[in-house]
């Protein structure tokens, strides 16, 4: 059954999708379109044919001076996109504007302060975790906040782990220098009894990342200032033993990461980091049962698959549209 609700929802971009947050926004667009909602990409930056084509089959609307919006149109805008917040504030006909804040620590790129957010004609905020909601409210944001957790695609799943050469997956995008520090400590402490291959997933497509993780025994995390930690969840879904930085500034207030699903190290604990990876290699080679891996897999299946995401999309956007999406079929 299609709903065919008579409104337009625009997800704002300034370039090709390339980050985890970008891909989450595209998941929102696809799911809303499955529900019969006219959701599109609003491209406000680089508008070359190559960039337009990077969104695949999703409809792209080019933002220019000729396009007109109604007061019922809805803009979904990332927290960092100051140009869109400023532009919308100056429009004669002001669309409904909703922030999709996927990282509270980058909110300063879009707004000067929490007070600036509260005073803006922004209607409400969507976030990917209760941690993000907590961090925004902690600093004084009073706008209504809804949570839609992203999902981990089913192609993130365990495969046969390579044993002749033990694969260790990582991304150095956020902590490039610290990977080099870690590797020095690791090579200084490792027994070198088993061959090890470090595989950098930075720059790979999401499907390529899934393949690397599925074959990797260990994922070493160089997360920093996370709102949820999507890459860590992908590694859990792939059956990796996750070791490293959680990415949370105050880990005790997050809803996902604890010692039952991985081994987490504090800032500067490079010796401990290397020791934990060395131990994990020995445990893997010896076939030791690892409850952290099983707990991580269980966490993903219970909370972060597409069925959970679609339920939250229906609930949150149904409230925004004032329409019962939860009892509709996609």
From Swiss-Prot:
Gene3D superfamilies: Glycogen Phosphorylase B. Does not require a metal cofactor. It is found in: Cytoplasm. Pfam families: Glyco_trans_1_4 (PF13692). It is an enzyme of class 2 (transferase). The keyword Ion transport does not apply. It comes from the Bacteria. Pathway: Protein modification; protein glycosylation. GO terms for biological process: protein N-linked glycosylation via asparagine. One of its GO terms (cellular component) is cytoplasm. GO terms for molecular function: UDP-glucosyltransferase activity. Its EC number is 2.4.1.-. Keywords: Cytoplasm, Glycosyltransferase, Transferase. Catalyzes the transfer of a glucose moiety from UDP-glucose to another glucose that is N-linked to an asparagine within a peptide or protein. Can act in a repetitive manner, and this way it elongates the N-linked glucose by a glycan chain consisting of several alpha-1->6 linked glucose residues. Is able to add up to six glucose units in vitro. Cannot use UDP-Gal, UDP-GlcNAc or UDP-GalNAc as a substrate donor. Belongs to the glycosyltransferase group 1 family. This is Alpha-1,6-glucosyltransferase. It comes from Actinobacillus pleuropneumoniae serotype 7 (strain AP76). The lineage of its organism: Bacteria, Pseudomonadati, Pseudomonadota, Gammaproteobacteria, Pasteurellales.
């Amino acid at each position: 059954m299609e709903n065919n609700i008579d409104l337009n929802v625009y997800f704002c971009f300034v370039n090709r999708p390339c980050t985890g947050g970008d891909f989450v926004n595209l998941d929102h667009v696809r799911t809303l379109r499955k529900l019969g909602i006219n959701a599109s990409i609003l491209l406000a930056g680089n508008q070359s044919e190559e960039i337009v084509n990077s969104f695949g089959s999703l409809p792209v609307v080019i933002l220019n001076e000729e396009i007109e919006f109604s007061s019922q149109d809805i803009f979904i805008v990332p927290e960092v996109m100051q140009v869109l917040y400023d532009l919308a504030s100056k429009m004669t006909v002001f669309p409904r504007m909703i922030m999709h804040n996927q990282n509270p620590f980058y909110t300063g790129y879009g707004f000067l302060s929490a007070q600036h957010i509260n005073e803006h004609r922004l209607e409400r905020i969507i976030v990917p975790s209760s941690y993000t909601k907590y961090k925004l409210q902690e600093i004084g944001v009073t706008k209504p906040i809804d949570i839609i957790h992203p999902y981990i695609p089913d192609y993130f799943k365990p495969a046969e782990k390579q044993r002749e050469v033990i694969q260790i997956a990582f991304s150095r995008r956020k902590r490039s220098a610290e990977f080099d520090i870690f590797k020095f400590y690791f090579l200084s402490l490792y027994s070198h009894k088993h061959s090890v291959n470090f595989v950098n997933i930075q720059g790979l497509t999401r499907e390529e990342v899934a393949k690397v993780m599925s074959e990797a025994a260990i994922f070493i995390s160089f997360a920093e200032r996370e709102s949820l930690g999507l890459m860590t969840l992908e590694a859990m879904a792939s059956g990796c033993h996750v070791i490293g930085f959680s990415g949370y500034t105050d880990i005790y207030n997050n809803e996902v990461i604890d010692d039952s699903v991985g081994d987490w190290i504090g800032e500067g604990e490079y010796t401990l980091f290397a020791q934990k990876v060395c131990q994990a290699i020995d445990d893997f080679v010896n076939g030791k049962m690892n409850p952290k891996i099983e707990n991580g897999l269980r966490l993903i299946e219970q909370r972060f698959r597409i069925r959970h995401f679609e339920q939250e999309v229906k609930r949150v956007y149904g409230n925004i549209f004032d329409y019962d999406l939860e009892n509709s079929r996609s």
